[in-house]
């Protein structure tokens, strides 16, 4: 089996783990390749452009935090992804560093299960050409440096949902509900729920609240403003600066992300641990 390995090159712990993984895979007769940036940091000749890894590899290993896993997921397509948490929260990265080798062994033996995670697909135009982006967590349209409050017009299946005067709009999957959407006041949604959540960012309207919709709905968002440029982001990466009245169409992608599951993890325990639920505030700090 051949593994594509993507690491957060800014984390020394991830570098150390990558070297340990290289040694283990070599010892056990398994092949591997790194994306170009990771290979340069590790000074290894086993490298390929990250766009080519999916064609060359049977599975992916992400060494970093949730951001590294999101980055990896954009290129893994249908291949299984083993997420090793070397970050902070680790909602998506299923395994700790100590669980790295056992996770690899499970994949090699074929004795593993998969979490299928839905993605968003956003369609827009650039220079007259239709472009698409896929996002595991969220698609965000925001006001950027625009000095006033724009109006975001949202339609569901062609019917007007509402016009939101706000700093931006977040459209999140159930997976992404614990990311930017949660920080903006959106609900936590259980993974694999067949819904999306639309969360306004700092709405200038007291009655506006996030709304949860069926993930079969087609969402259209346009910006009503006299001028300005408005960033369109997918999973935290800028994809385009939108013009006023330009429309972005968001729907469920046909492609899912296959995350190798850690059967020792419990989602309720993750919420309690990561979000510090039920813990007393330490008054000494």
From Swiss-Prot:
GO cellular component, as recorded: cytoplasm
GO molecular function per UniProt: ATP binding; metal ion binding; NAD binding; NAD+ kinase activity
Entry EC number(s): 2.7.1.23
Active site per the UniProt annotation: 66 (proton acceptor)
Binding site for NAD(+): 66-67, 137-138, 148, 165, 167, 178-183
UniProt function note: Involved in the regulation of the intracellular balance of NAD and NADP, and is a key enzyme in the biosynthesis of NADP. Catalyzes specifically the phosphorylation on 2'-hydroxyl of the adenosine moiety of NAD to yield NADP.
Protein name in the entry: NAD kinase
